[in-house]
Amino acid sequence: MDPNCSCASDGSCSCAGACKCKQCKCTSCKKSCCSCCPVGCAKCSQGCICKEASDKCSCCA
């Protein structure tokens, strides 16, 4: 169980809202979770589960 994620490491979870971990280890969400995805960010759409939009896009740099 990830201490920052509300799901077991081998279970399913929805990272979009509840997950605060940088690296989700859930089998249903292998992409990293972040809140750094402005609209139109191609890299984030490929490698991030966006929690909320932000102009500070560290995972797209």
From Swiss-Prot:
A divalent metal cation 2 binds at C7, C13, C15, C26. One of its GO terms (molecular function) is zinc ion binding. A divalent metal cation 4 binds at C33, C34, C44, C48. Residues 1-29 are annotated as: Beta. Keywords: Acetylation, Metal-binding, Metal-thiolate cluster, Phosphoprotein. A divalent metal cation 7 binds at C50, C57, C59, C60. InterPro entries: Metalthion_dom_sf (IPR017854), Metalthion_dom_sf_vert (IPR023587), Metalthion_vert (IPR000006), Metalthion_vert_metal_BS (IPR018064). A divalent metal cation 1 binds at C5, C7, C21, C24. The keyword Phosphoprotein applies. This is Metallothionein-2. The gene is Mt2.
